[in-house]
């Protein structure tokens, strides 16, 4: 095996890439449209349903409309193997599916906008279910384009970071932006405005360079079983004996964050902070702090390498929960402890954003160009599932231990994950045995 770029990372400029790499600006636009749909079928829509007088129980049940995001790996193999009708010939497989998915998101947003959950909730549910499917599909195909556009980890880190920045901007628009518009234009106007914002992604998809893998002859069509199984078989075969350790690392990487996040808002409320305090710090201040963590990850990975960054991400992501433990022990005076609250959220948000970009980059390097959407979708689901399950038990743990020891405990969860990351680094970090088939295009 040849030595991999993990060992000798190539210096890749982060800021100048926005102007010198023709993939970056489209990635920023595509990321922004990827960040819009989720909140519009989740938290933002919950606000509309509350205004419409829908019961709390029903609103809670309707949060399950986001299930498509958890199971998107199911239909991902078909997006990897088949071209979209008509558009595939013009834009290629990846960009063609992006336009199809964006069109679906726009259409569903218009459908929701012209509904009235107070009068006909079934209409809203139907279009929201379709919006969840279209939004999850959009995530898949954008990830597929990003992964197949560039392979070396140091370049993938830059592209992933700019895509993540776009996602955060879109998420801000669909969250705080949509709520502000709803106060001024009503909910119909807010959802129509979000649909109009999706046009940014249409332009970005047309301007985005076609991945070179899209220009190669596609593999022959296969049956249903082979289409679904082929990405899993290829990934496990390529990872070889290290597959269990690598997959366990991915499953555990975000586990501390998922478990801690479930109790973060309850902690803030328990400590006496108002809704305004929480919104100001977590949404406005937290947005900029998160961008800082994203910028740092995109700049650091090309300089120190993938595995050192992965180890830092595991340690920082879990150790940051000690700041939440400190707030639980010393921040119980509400507004009087506002700056303790702000610093705590800043530390946790910065570390979370940094670790997220590192993990996205690492999972992207594990996915092959042929099965990019399928394998990345599988890895993201593997990453989310264990933490989501444990998060459901977090309230019971807090009742037994209190907030302080709970967050100390979530930070300690990261210790075995960090040891596993170090072990994987030692065993495979100096070779390219787990890297996808050689493809070092810039």
Residue ranges and their predicted role:
Residues 5-21, 212-246:
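Juxtamembrane intracellular "pre-TM" segments in multi-pass secondary transporters
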Residues 9-69, 243-249, 253-271, 279:
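Helix-loop boundary and gating motifs at the non-cytosolic
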Residues 68, 72-75, 281-303, 313, ...:
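Transmembrane alpha-helices of Major Facilitator/SLC transporters
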Residues 69-72, 157-182, 380-391:
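Glycine-rich segments within core transmembrane alpha-helices of 12-TM secondary carriers
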Residues 72-90, 292-308, 398-399:
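Helix-to-loop junctions at the C-terminal end of transmembrane segments
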Residues 96-118, 315-334:
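C-terminal ends and interior cores of transmembrane alpha-helices
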Residues 100-106, 189-207, 405-423:
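Symmetry-related core transmembrane helices of the 12-TM Major Facilitator Superfamily/SLC fold
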Residues 308-359:
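C-terminal transmembrane helical hairpin of 12-TM major facilitator-type secondary transporters
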């Amino acid at each position: 095996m040849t030595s991999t770029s993990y060992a000798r990372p190539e210096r890749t400029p982060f800021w100048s890439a926005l102007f010198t790499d023709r993939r970056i600006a489209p990635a920023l636009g595509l990321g922004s449209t990827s960040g819009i749909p989720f909140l519009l079928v989740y938290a933002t829509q919950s606000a509309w349903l509350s205004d419409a007088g829908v019961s709390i129980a029903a609103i809670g049940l309707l949060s399950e409309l986001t299930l498509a995001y958890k199971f998107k790996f199911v239909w991902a193999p078909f997006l990897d193997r088949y071209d979209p009708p008509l558009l595939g010939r013009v834009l290629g497989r990846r960009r063609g599916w992006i336009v199809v998915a964006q069109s679906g998101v726009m259409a569903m947003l218009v459908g929701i906008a012209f509904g009235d959950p107070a009068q006909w909730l079934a209409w809203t549910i139907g279009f929201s279910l379709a919006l969840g499917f279209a939004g999850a599909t959009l995530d898949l195909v954008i990830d597929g384009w990003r992964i197949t556009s560039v392979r070396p980890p140091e370049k993938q880190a830059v592209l992933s970071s700019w895509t993540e920045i776009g996602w955060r901007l879109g998420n801000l628009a669909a969250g705080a932006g949509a709520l502000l518009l709803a106060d001024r234009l009503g909910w119909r106007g807010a959802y129509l405005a979000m649909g109009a914002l999706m046009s940014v992604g249409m332009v970005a998809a047309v301007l985005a360079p076609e991945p070179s893998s899209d220009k190669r002859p596609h593999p022959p069509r296969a049956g249903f079983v082979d289409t679904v199984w082929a990405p899993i078989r290829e990934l496990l075969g390529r990872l070889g004996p290290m597959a269990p350790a690598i997959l366990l690392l991915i499953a555990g990487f975000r586990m501390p964050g998922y478990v801690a996040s479930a109790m973060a808002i309850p902690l803030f409320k328990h400590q006496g902070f108002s809704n305004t305090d929480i919104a100001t710090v977590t949404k406005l201040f937290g947005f900029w702090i998160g961008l800082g963590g994203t910028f740092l990850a995109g700049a650091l990975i090309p300089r120190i390498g993938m595995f050192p960054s992965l180890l830092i991400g595991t340690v920082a992501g879990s150790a940051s929960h000690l700041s939440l433990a400190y707030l639980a022990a010393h921040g119980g005076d509400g507004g009087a402890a506002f700056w303790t609250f702000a610093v705590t959220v800043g530390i946790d948000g910065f570390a979370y954003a940094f670790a997220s970009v590192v993990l996205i980059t690492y999972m992207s390097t594990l996915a092959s160009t042929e099965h990019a959407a399928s394998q990345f979708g599988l890895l993201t689901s593997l990453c989310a599932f264990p933490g989501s399950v444990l998060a459901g038990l977090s309230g019971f743990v807090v009742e037994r231990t209190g907030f302080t020891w709970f967050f100390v405990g979530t930070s300690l969860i990261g210790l075995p994950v960090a040891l596993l990351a170090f072990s994987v680094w030692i065993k495979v970090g100096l070779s390219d045995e787990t890297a996808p088939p050689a493809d070092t295009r810039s």
